[in-house]
Amino acid sequence: MKMSLVLVGSILIVNGGNLPSSSADSQHVPHQVSSHTSGDKSQHKRMAIIIDDVGNNMKGTAEILATPVKLTVAVMPFLQTTKKDAIAAHEKGMDVIVHMPMEPKKGRPEWLGPGAITSNLTDEEVRDRVEKAIDDVPYAIGMNNHMGSKITSDKRIMSIVLDVCQERGLFFVDSRTNFRSVVGELAVTKGMPPVGNDIFLDDHNSKQRIRKQMDLAAQRALDKDVCVVIGHVGHTGMNTSAVVHESVSRLKGQIEFVGIGDLVRDVWHWKPELKLPTDNK
């Protein structure tokens, strides 16, 4: 059966269900000090901007792909422009990661889109879905969670997700949609980089709010040497892309905009061999 995904107003509809953004699941990222500082205070102040929800021809996608600095696009698997958007981002020199749909604490699983990780799956089913998602997103070097406040606090499931990522040479970015997330501690025990989101840019759809969040992110990068932020295409896409473009120009010379892969390699020295299918390179 063909799955129908359309944009109605500001929300994706998947077989009649809504597909909200990760920030809608989280509301706020917990204020905590992350382990992103490398100790070399002479290094550039760096910011990695991850743009979620790419892969379904969403508002702001073209504008994000036209950004004149290196961004990271988190592409949802199995959607109408998954491969097109991932390839376009890669060809522009951006990093590509899998935006893995995961069950939230609140909301129906069918809101998530195809191939979602839900709490009723067996170990084998979790592994199979993660493998297939990686296979579906060309040039993916990592993964983060779409929504997932329920799953990222589940040690059984997240252990399997991280195992598959590690086996395939991918890192996992915790979007931090739940302050009880176990992703960071599991990553450390598995020898993987405990990288996570510091600030959501567009928890409210206004340029004023997004600018304020970008200012907070810039200050964090200046204070801590690095900052990881997440924005979205779709409902907030046009405002987010506009503010990102403004900020790139305004912060030039103060902050270097890098892909998340650059931070993972430089800060955590993560340099595994990617194991991708032959048609996904």
Question: What does each model-identified segment do?
Answer:
Residues 48-50, 54, 70-75, 113-122, ...:
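Second-shell loop/turn segments in exported
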